[in-house]
Amino acid sequence: MASYKFKTQNSFLLLLSISFFFLLLLNKVNSTGSLSFSFPKFKHSQPDLIFQSDALVTSKGVLQLTTVNDGRPVYDSIGRVLYAAPFQIWDSTTGNVASFVTSFSFIIKAPNEGKTADGLVFFLAPVGSTQPLKGGGLLGLFKDESYNKSNQIVAVEFDTFRNVAWDPNGIHMGIDVNSIQSVRTVRWDWANGEVANVFISYEASTKSLTASLVYPSLEKSFILSAIVDLKKVLPEWVRVGFTATTGLSEDYVQTNDVLSWSFESNLPGGNSVASVKNAGLSTYAA
C-alpha cells in the first residue's frame, strides 16, 4: 500500500513538473525576460557562481556548501553559493511577475543520525545580498529570528535541527518569507547519505510556490506549497542560490552537498539578462 501511495504521488509530481516546464517553454515565445542554466556537475573554476564563506567545489565536481575535513563535517561552518547573473523577478513597468522552475539533487550525511544540524536552503535574495555572520539555526539567511520585510528573502529550507524558538517539532521542509520562522512546513523524513531530488516551482498567475522532494531509492516523497506574492516581498532584480550551515557544537554536524542544479525563469515582456547593465546592476559583482 505504501508503494502504491508513493507511485501515485510521484506520478502526480512528475506530471505537474512536466506540465509546468512546458508551460514555461510556451510562454517564452512572447518573453524577453528569462534566465536559464544547468549544472549536471560543478567545476573548480566556475566564474558564473559566487562563493561565500566556506563553500567550494570538490575534485569530484560536488558543490560542498560547508566544510569537511578528512571526511568529517566541521561544526560552526557556513557557506553560500549564488548564480552570478541577476534576473528580473518582476517588472515595475508592466507589473508582470516571473514564473520559475528549479531542480537540484543533494546529499546530507551525518556521522550521528541522532545529532544533525543545521540545514540546506534554496533561496532568492537581493543582488547585493551578503552572508550574515551568524550560522547555526539561522541557516546563513538572517541576522536574527525576527520578521523583517527589509530582508527581502524567499527560501525553501531543508532543516535538520529543531530550534525551539521558531521551528516545528522534528526535521522538516519549510517555506521562509523574510524570517527564519517558516510560513509553511511539512515533516521531512531525512535519509542519511541518500540522494534527494528536489523540484521547486513558482506560478506567477496563482502566486503558488511549491516544493517537492523525492528519495528515489527509498520510495519516499514530500511536498509543500504556499501562496507568496513575490512582487511584494522581493526587489525587482534578484539572485538565486544555496546556503547551508552545520551545528554550533562538534557533535551536531553534517555534510551539505549539492550534486546538480538547473534553473529556468520566464518574465513576459521583461528585460533579458543581457540588459542587466541597463538597470545599473553588475552581472558578476558580489
Swiss-Prot record:
Molecular function via GO: carbohydrate binding; metal ion binding
Keywords from the named record: Calcium, Glycoprotein, Lectin, Manganese, Metal-binding, Signal
Binding positions (Ca(2+)): D159, N163, D167
Matching InterPro entries: ConA-like_dom_sf (IPR013320), L-lectin (IPR016363), Lectin_LegA_CS (IPR000985), Lectin_legB_Mn/Ca_BS (IPR019825), Legume_lectin_dom (IPR001220), Leguminous_Lectin (IPR050258)
Expression sites by tissue: Mostly in the axial and ray parenchymal cells of the inner bark. Fewer in the axial and ray parenchymal cells of the xylem. Strong expression in bark. The lectin accumulates in the inner bark in autumn and winter and disappears in may.
Residues binding Mn(2+): E157, D159, D167, H172
One Pfam family this sequence matches: Lectin_legB
Positions of glycan attachment: N148
Signal peptide: 1-31
Family to which this protein belongs: Belongs to the leguminous lectin family.
Subunit structure comment from the entry: RPbAI is composed of two polypeptides, A and B, that associate into five different tetrameric isolectins. The A4 combination is the only one devoid of agglutination activity. Isoform B4 displays maximal agglutination activity.
Function: Bark lectins are storage proteins that probably maintain stocks of nitrogen during dormant period. Self-aggregatable molecules that can bind their own carbohydrate side chains. They could also play a role in the plant's defense against phytophagous invertebrates or herbivorous higher animals.
Protein name as catalogued: Bark agglutinin I polypeptide B
Organism encoding this protein: Robinia pseudoacacia
